[in-house]
Amino acid sequence: MATHGRIQAMRAALAALVVWAAGSAGLAGVGVAHAEVAAADPIDVAMRQCLARRDRSSPAGQIQCMGETQQQWQAVVDGAYQRLLKDAPADAKRGWQDSQRHWLTWRKDEVHLLKAVYDTTRGTSYAMSSADLQLQPVRDRALALRAAADRYAPPPAAVPVAATSGAQGSASDAPSAAKPNGKPANAPRDPAVRRVRPCEQDAACEHALFDLNRYYQKLRRKMPAHSAATLVRAQRAWVGFRDATAPLVGEGGRVDLIGARIATMKRLSETAGNQ
């Protein structure tokens, strides 16, 4: 009965998480990306519908829904990254390439960390939790890359004058063409790479790192000794990703990255060793 209760609670939490994440910046990978995502992203809607299906009501079915959703977000990651390589200015392109390399390295090491943590637990509800923790960083990355790709997308092609000869007004009266991100085509671009202060000079960053270290140490104490290197490796890879990405998203975005990591570390520290 206790296991069934945990599964039911996990299903409700997953459904609530999809609704919350679709419309909230929250503790997200990049705050700007989450602020710009539509309140009802089709991928989130599809996941919510999948989780509600009767033939997916079992833990295995719920995990299957999350796996399919992760694949869809990964496709967004791949597509947005290719758009960035095509459209972004040289400095932004180099920055996002470095960020993506570090993100991929972190994700590989993070898979080993999740396995090490969930190997200390028992019960199908924890398998669902592990699947969710693998999904969310991919979603965060997809939103961040999609927002960046939209920012650098070329403006739509100008309408030929002849095609507008019968329309009211003239081309000179028309407002500047809007870019996909909603800004006029002739508007100055935001700086591709920002200067960010060291974290110890940024009070918000320093406070966030304090909280992160607290949960990191709690998890370290609960992990088996033979898994210590796995935790250190995953955290070191995440730090590399954070530092490579911070100049692209600014100090506020860096705090959002740390916030997402705090949420993960808190969850893992509360999960490790549960039976």
Report residues per predicted region.
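Bacterial N-terminal signal peptides that target proteins for export
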Residues: 2-26
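Compositionally biased, intrinsically disordered low-complexity segments enriched
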Residues: 20-34, 179
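N-terminal alpha-helical modules
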Residues: 33-275
